[in-house]
Amino acid sequence: MKKIEIELNERSYPIHLGTMECLEHAGAVLVVTNPKVGGLYLSYVLERIRAREVFVCTTPDGEAYKTLESVEMILESAFNHRLDRKSLMIALGGGVIGDMVGFASGIFQRGIGFVQIPTTLLSQVDASVGGKTGVNNAFGKNLIGLFHQPKAVYIDPLFLKSLPPREFGAGVAEMVKMAVTFDREFFEELERGDLRDHSFLLKGIERCVKIKARVVAMDEREQGIRAALNYGHTFGHVIEHESGYGHYLHGEAVGMGMVMANTLACGLGLLKESEAERIEKLLARYEIPTRYAIGDVERFYDLFFLDKKSENQKIKFILPEGIGGVAFRDDLSKSMVLSVLEAFCD
C-alpha cells in the first residue's frame, strides 16, 4: 500500500492507496454509507475495522439527498449510539456520502474525527481529499458547509470494479480537469493512454492525488490557487441546479461546464480552439456529455452570483490558460458572458 501525506502541520494526514489494511480506533466508530455501497462493500470494510464499538448508519443514495435532513439523520444516529468527542465517523461511499459525513463530523459536539473511504472514481481522485464538506439547498450546491480535514483517506481500487460506466466517466472528467489546470504532461498521457486499462488508471489516480495534495498544502482554505480546481464548476453547479440534482452526475456537469469555460477562454485568447477541441475530444472518448442546452440565459447568468467564489457581486471564472495553466477572471462584462451562454441555447 502506497502512502501520500497531506502536509497541513497539526492537521496533516495520510492517503493510503491500495488494498485496504486494518483501521484501528480506540473509541466508538460510526460507519455511514448508502444501501447500494453498503450492500457491496460494508462487510469488506467492517472486517478491517478494529474499534471498541462499530455502528452503521445508512442514508438514501444520490445527490438529491445531500441535504441538511440527511445530515440530521447522521447526527441522530451518532447521538442514539452515544458517540462522544473521542469517537470516529467513517464515510463509505462517493462524494455525496463524503461531503455529508465530513460536515456531520465537523459539527457533532463541535467536531470529531472522520475517515474517508471513497468508492467512486470521482471521490478517489478529488472529493475525498482536502477537507471540503457540505450540503446543497434550494439556492445552490454546497452552499452550507465547512472545511474539516479527515484523519485519513483509504483509496482501494477494489471499489471501482462495480462502478457503472457513467460513474466512471464522471470521475474521468475530474481527472481531465486536474490535467488541464495543473499538468500538461499528464493531459498528454491521458490522450495517449486508456483509463479503462487498470494499471494506467491506478497511475492516473495516484497522479491526481499528488496534484490535489500539493494544491491543498499550498492553499487549504481556497483563498488562492486551490480555486483553480473549480475549473468547470462555476458553469457545472448551475447546470446541476437547473437540471435538478441527480439528473446529471456531478462529474458530467463539470465536463459540460469545462466546455463552456473553454468557449469563454477561447473568446478571451487564453485558449486555442485546437486545445479546446482536444479537451472536448478527451471527455467524449469516455462518453461524458459535453453539451448542455441552456433554456434561459438570463436566469443561468444570475445563478452565477450564488457561486461561493463570487465576491462583491463579481463572478469569478476559472479559465484554462492553455493546457496546463489557469487564469482567474472577475472582470468580464455581462454581455461577453451572455454571448457565450447563447452559444449553448437549445
Curated annotation (Swiss-Prot):
Q: Does the keyword Zinc-finger apply?
A: no
Write down the EC number: 4.2.3.4
Matching entries from Gene3D superfamilies are given as:
3.40.50.1970, Dehydroquinate synthase-like - alpha domain
Query: Where does this protein reside within or beyond the cell?
Result: Cytoplasm
Pfam families the record matches: DHQ_synthase, DHQS_C
The answer to keyword Repressor applying to this record is no
- Free-text cofactor note: Binds 1 divalent metal cation per subunit. Can use either Co(2+) or Zn(2+).
Q: At which positions is NAD(+) bound?
A: 61-66, 95-99, 119-120, 132, 141
Q: Which GO terms describe its molecular function?
A: 3-dehydroquinate synthase activity; metal ion binding; nucleotide binding
Q: Which reaction does it catalyse?
A: 7-phospho-2-dehydro-3-deoxy-D-arabino-heptonate = 3-dehydroquinate + phosphate
EC class: lyase
Hey, which pathway is this one from?
Answer: Metabolic intermediate biosynthesis; chorismate biosynthesis; chorismate from D-erythrose 4-phosphate and phosphoenolpyruvate: step 2/7
Cofactors named for this entry: NAD(+); Co(2+); Zn(2+)
Gene Ontology BP, a term: amino acid biosynthetic process
CDD domains in the record: DHQS
Positions contributing to Zn(2+) binding: 174, 233, 250
Query: Record's SUPFAM superfamilies?
Result: Dehydroquinate synthase-like
- Identify the keywords attached in UniProt to this record, alphabetized: Amino-acid biosynthesis, Aromatic amino acid biosynthesis, Cobalt, Cytoplasm, Lyase, Metal-binding, NAD, Nucleotide-binding, Zinc
Matching entries from HAMAP family are given as: DHQ_synthase
Q: Which family does it belong to?
A: Belongs to the sugar phosphate cyclases superfamily. Dehydroquinate synthase family.
What job does this protein perform? Catalyzes the conversion of 3-deoxy-D-arabino-heptulosonate 7-phosphate (DAHP) to dehydroquinate (DHQ).
What PANTHER family does the database record attribute to this sequence? 3-DEHYDROQUINATE SYNTHASE, 3-DEHYDROQUINATE SYNTHASE, CHLOROPLASTIC
Name of the protein in its database record: 3-dehydroquinate synthase
